[in-house]
Amino acid sequence: MAEWHKIIEDISKNNKFEDAAIVDYKTTKNVLAAIPNRTFAKINPLITNRNILKPLIGQKYCIVYTNSLMDENTYAMELLTGYAPVSPIVIARTHTALIFLMGKPTTSRRDVYRTCRDHATRVRATGN
């Protein structure tokens, strides 16, 4: 099993990011790790299943920017918050979990994408 809490701890130390969570989408469909008392800590199993159709994350509406979540080469979805100030969000898929990462409004979309994909790639390399 991947060390989910270490990934969240690493992300929370970086001042560029506002929120992060890791959600199991294969078996239990619950939050495995998250920054406490933030939006993504409120993700529930229904959100995990329907997120591709109507993006509502932690009770916040989002706009899909790109969706390659099911592509085995890309395995990521980029979104923007549907309210001001606009923040970039990336969801990356490992073999067993989804990694949710939201940048601050001043953080570039590419920084959020790169960080989320890097974590997912490392976890995928371990087989999780």
UniProtKB/Swiss-Prot annotation:
InterPro entries, sorted: PFN, PFN_euk, PFN_sf, Profilin_CS
Disulfide pattern: none
GO molecular function: actin binding
Key word Ribosomal protein present: no
PROSITE patterns, per the entry: PROFILIN
Keyword Nucleus: no
Keyword entries, A-Z: Actin-binding
Family per similarity comment: Belongs to the profilin family.
Protein name: Profilin
Protein species of origin: Vaccinia virus (strain Ankara) (VACV)
